[in-house]
């Protein structure tokens, strides 16, 4: 059964090497990134696993959306760039899965055009993302989000 605690993510009140697994969804880009990674390493057992999904700051459409929607942002928000991805590599053995290049804009269009989200446009966008990720790996950095799966070094 999970237990929930409210505390400073930069100074967790858990013992060293306490957790087997640490999960986060769109949280790291709101924190002092290196301090947060250090704290995750501290509370994670050797060989412990991480799973994070975070926005990428490299995507030009994402940059435009952030510029056009400042009311939906917080001052501490810093989507991940190459530097942050390399900081992860220093502490964890990771695999990265990139998602949402075409699926975001075409998903929005799909929501306007169709009542049912399971339609040809949504499927096309999803399959385009999968294909581009496989066939043109350098494009992965232009995707909107990254899913990071890793093990503590």
Set out the residue ranges of the language-model regions:
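A conserved beta-strand element that flanks and buttresses the S-adenosyl-L-methionine
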Residues: 23
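Short alpha-helix
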Residues: 77-98
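A short glycine-rich, Lys/Arg-flanked "PGG" loop and its adjoining helix->strand segment in the class I
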Residues: 35-49
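A short His-aromatic
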Residues: 26-30
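Conserved SAM-binding strand-loop segment of SAM-dependent methyltransferases
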Residues: 1-15
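Conserved class I S-adenosyl-L-methionine
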Residues: 49-76
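A C-terminal cap/extension of S-adenosyl-L-methionine-dependent methyltransferases
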Residues: 98-153
């Amino acid at each position: 059964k999970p237990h929930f605690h409210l505390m400073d993510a930069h100074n967790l009140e858990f013992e060293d090497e306490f957790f087997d697994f640490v999960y986060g969804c769109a949280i790291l880009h709101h924190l002092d990134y290196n301090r947060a990674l250090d704290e995750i390493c501290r509370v994670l057992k050797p060989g412990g696993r991480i799973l994070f999904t975070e926005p990428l700051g490299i995507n030009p459409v994402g940059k435009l959306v952030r510029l056009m929607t400042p009311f939906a942002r917080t001052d501490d928000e810093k989507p991940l760039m190459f530097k942050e991805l390399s900081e992860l590599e220093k502490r964890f053995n990771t695999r990265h899965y990139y998602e949402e290049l075409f699926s975001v804009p075409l998903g929005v269009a799909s929501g306007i055009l169709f009542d049912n989200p399971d339609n040809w446009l949504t499927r096309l966008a999803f399959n385009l993302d999968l294909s581009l990720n496989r066939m043109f790996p350098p494009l992965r950095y232009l995707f909107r989000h990254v899913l990071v799966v890793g093990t503590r070094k």
